[in-house]
């Protein structure tokens, strides 16, 4: 199922420190159902021959400023190593941007934990500017 494939994709290519506790797949499936039922969340996946090879998670957040226009946050952009540089993640980022536009968002916000120039260039090539704002992160236990 998509849940098992997403878990594998995340843990192999995205998460530097996979969870030490066993992940309940029914919880994963339920969360994915909740995402699909929520008009402000999109969990986008790209499949090739029935295999999930890329994914992007986008959430629209309501806002009290900028004429009450919401903004969107993109997280968990990941592509299987064997399927990179084939346009899959770019297509999903475009779909995420269209989703944000459909909600009248004034911006799409994306952070990456990577400092690799190739990763930053990938985002720049997909319309995301770097160096315009400063991001602050507080990790919680």
Question: Model features per residue range: what roles?
Answer:
Residues 1-8:
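A short beta-loop-alpha structural element at the N-terminal edge
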Residues 33-45, 73:
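A short helix-loop-beta-strand connector motif used in the catalytic cores of GNAT acetyltransferases and
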Residues 43-45, 51-60, 78:
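Conserved beta-strand in the GNAT
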